[in-house]
Structures are given as C-alpha cells and as structure tokens.
Amino acid sequence: MHRKIIGFIVSFMAITATGQNLMPSGSPLYKLPYKNTYVMETLVAENAFRTMKPKKQIPESFEHAKRVLPEPYWEGHSKEIDMYWKAWQLGIKNVCQPLDESGFVSSYIAPAYNGNIFMWDDAFITMFCRYGRRYFPFQNTLNNFYSKQHPDGFICREIRADGSDCFGRYDPTSTGPNLLPWSEWLYYIQFGDDSRLNMVFPVLAAYYKWLKLNRTWRNGTYWSSGWGTGMDNMPRVPEGYNTIYSNGHMVWLDACLQQIMVANILLKMGFYLERWQEIEEFEDDIRSLSDYINRHMWSEKDGFLY
C-alpha cells in the first residue's frame, strides 16, 4: 500500500509538472503538448497574414521624406510646423524590422516604449501615418498583429519583438481596445485599397466575434479592464477591485461603444466586399447593444452616458 501511494504521488507530480512545463528537459514527458482549448473560428482560415512571408523595407532618409510628405502651411505658426516635422522625424527613427523567426511579416513603426508593439498605440499611429503613404507603407504595421491571430480569432494587445504574446488570451488585460478596424477603414476611404480591405476583413471580423464570445456578460454587454481599454489611470471599478487588472464585474461603456462602432465599420466593409452572410449578425448586435445603452446607461439628469 505504501509503495502504491508513493507511486501515485510521483505520477501526479509528473503530470502536474508537465502541465506547467516544469519537467526536466531529459524527461520523456517534457514535450507532451498541453490540451488544445481552441474553438476554431472559420474566418481565421482566410487570414493570409498568418502564412505570409516576411517583407522588410528600410525607410529612406528624412530629407527624402520632407520632399514627399504633406507640407503644412500655417502663417505665423512656425513652431507648430517645426513640431509637425519633428513628429515625422521621430516616427521614422522608430521604424523597426521584423526579427527572424518572430512571425512578424512587415517592417513596422513601434510605439517606442518597451520594444513591444501595442494594439492601442499602433492603431492611432497608423491613423496619423496614413498621410505618409507615399513615403513608407506605415499601414503594414498592423499586419504583424494580424499575423499573430490565434485560431479562435484572438489577437493580443501587446506583442514582443520576438513575436510572443505578452498575455494569455483569457487574461482580463490581454486584448483591446478594438480600434484596428477604425484605422483600416480610414485608410480605405482615403486610398480605396480594395486588395487590403479584402485581406483584413476576415481578420477583423474574427477578432470581433472573439470579443463577443469571450468579453461579454449574459445580456450581451461588454467588459474590459484598465489595461484592456488603455485607460488604466482612470479609476472606475468599485472598491476592492484592481483599477488596472480587474473588470470589476461591470458593464464597460467604452468597450460597448467601440463594438457598436466596429460593427458599423464591418457592415460597410462587408457591403463593399459583398460578404452578406458574415455581416447579418452585426446589424442585430448594433441594434441590441444600442438599445441597452440608451435604456440603462444614459442619464437624463446629467445628459451623459455612464
């Protein structure tokens, strides 16, 4: 009996350690895969970025950039114009090349924070940088997020230069805010790049569906976290919850409004691309989520949404 108990304990420790990757490298159990928990999203099968070959592009000099970038004219505001050019100069200095074996597929402009790329930062950076399209394909920065999409549609909000996610997908701080479609739509209406629109639509639709499946309460409203919204310095969760890491068991207004905005954008994209089947649910989502917000989150007294 004593021998059986010891054998059971050893076996249990081995299995537990395997799940936590704690077994020594020489152990025959070391390379056993962890259970695959992905629920596959069919739209991800259309994601061409996941199998795209990396393409590196070195930006030309800042002097060349000044000849092709939009040149502002604002009489009496020379300092502001100097700031404009300085912003471009700094941005160009922060163009990075994808590391070998990282899985990144495009040269990209980095937020210049900790060496990682951030969903929030790069969405806004590409909105600004679309005006520099004649100089450098800054929009391709977002390709690196798309190339890292998981089989269920998840995209991590922060990804290291080596291509690894900074958070597990079920971490409350792992993703968001969902602003990538906004950047892509602005790019499309300015340049009419049908080829890019066709490539990004299934990626963005799959990510939208992941959020709907994994970031909602039973009534269809959305939750997030301080890091997930990008507003970690705005305390709003009840006392006892962490401002940065917790959802506070709350309905998060900004996350709800972003999904309404994104659903509208995906509707427009789907209309142009004739993806009628995929966009049906977006109309229903807009209607039901808007109705909830107007009924429960609008203050007649303050004239404000909470």
Where are these regions (language model features)?
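Short helix-capping and inter-helix turn/linker motifs at the boundaries of alpha-helical repeat units
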Residues: M1, N114-F118, P202
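Bacterial Sec-dependent N-terminal signal peptides
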Residues: M1-Q20
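Low-complexity, Ser/Thr/Pro/Gly-enriched N-terminal "stalk/linker" regions
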Residues: Q20-G115, N140, Y292-M297
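The feature captures the catalytic groove of carbohydrate-active enzymes
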Residues: S25-P54, P111-A112, F154-L179, K212-D284, ...
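Well-ordered alpha-helical scaffold segments within catalytic/enzyme domains
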Residues: A65-S78, A123-F136, L179-R196, L257-W276
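Active-site acid/base region of carbohydrate-active enzymes
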Residues: V68-K93, G132, F145, H150-F154, ...
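Alpha-helical support elements that line or immediately flank enzyme active sites
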Residues: G115-Q149
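C-terminal capping/lid segments that line or modulate ligand- or cofactor-binding pockets
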Residues: I117, Y170-G176, L180-Q190, W298-Y306
